């Protein structure tokens, strides 16, 4: 299914469709080619971090909150922070030099990363072959001494763990040099 078919399918379904299983499989194959080992747990479909936490609170490492944002200039950002991190968009906008930073509409998310709201993940960046999405990472994720970073594997009915070093290598392989910011 190409990007336009996915956008059309989600539109026709009234937004009820979730990222197809084949995208998760595609991600897993990509990670395997990079020799990146992950852990994965299945859970009911969740749409917020609050809904997800009862299913993942037992995992060692850090759980992410992921936001797909755009600015006034139509630049797009995938912001990944620790799950309980408060995020002030005005301050983030200033730090990134991104005027009027706000949540991007789901259609743009589907066009760029082929996932729906509730499924946003840094792992979707392997599909951004145009490299039009800027990855922004909370320094706590990569330099906080965590064994794993937990995020969705293209679907909001599972959570995947990846080491901080492997996430950085994944981003390097997808040619997404992350902007790493301290939010403390």
Swiss-Prot record:
In Pfam terms, one family for this protein is tRNA_edit
- By its UniProt entry, which CDD domains does this protein fall under? PrdX_deacylase
Q: Which InterPro entries did the record assign?
A: ProX/PRXD1 (IPR040285), YbaK/aa-tRNA-synt-asso_dom_sf (IPR036754), YbaK/aa-tRNA-synth-assoc-dom (IPR007214)
List the Gene3D superfamilies hit by this protein, alphabetically.
Answer: YbaK/aminoacyl-tRNA synthetase-associated domain
A molecular function annotated in GO for this UniProt entry is: aminoacyl-tRNA deacylase activity
Q: Into which family does the record put it?
A: Belongs to the PRORSD1 family.
* UniProt name for this protein: Prolyl-tRNA synthetase associated domain-containing protein 1
Source species: Danio rerio (Zebrafish)
State the gene name recorded for this protein.
Prorsd1
């Amino acid at each position: 299914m190409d990007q336009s078919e996915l956008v059309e399918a989600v539109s026709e379904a009234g937004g009820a469709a979730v990222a197809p299983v084949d995208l998760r499989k595609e991600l897993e194959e990509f990670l395997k080619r990079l020799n990146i080992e992950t852990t994965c747990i299945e859970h009911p479909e969740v749409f917020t971090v609050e809904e997800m936490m009862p299913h993942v609170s037992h995992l060692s490492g850090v759980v992410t909150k992921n936001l797909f944002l755009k600015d006034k200039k139509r630049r797009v950002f995938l912001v990944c922070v620790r799950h309980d991190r408060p995020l002030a968009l005005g301050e983030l906008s200033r730090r990134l030099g991104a005027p009027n930073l706000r949540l991007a509409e789901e259609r743009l998310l589907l066009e760029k990363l082929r996932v729906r709201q509730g499924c946003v993940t840094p792992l979707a960046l392997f599909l951004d072959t145009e490299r039009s999405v800027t990855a922004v990472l909370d320094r706590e994720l990569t330099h906080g001494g965590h064994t794993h970073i937990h995020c969705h594997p293209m679907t909001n009915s599972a959570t995947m763990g990846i080491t901080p070093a492997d996430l950085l290598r994944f981003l390097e392989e997808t040619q997404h040099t992350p902007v790493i910011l301290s939010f403390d």
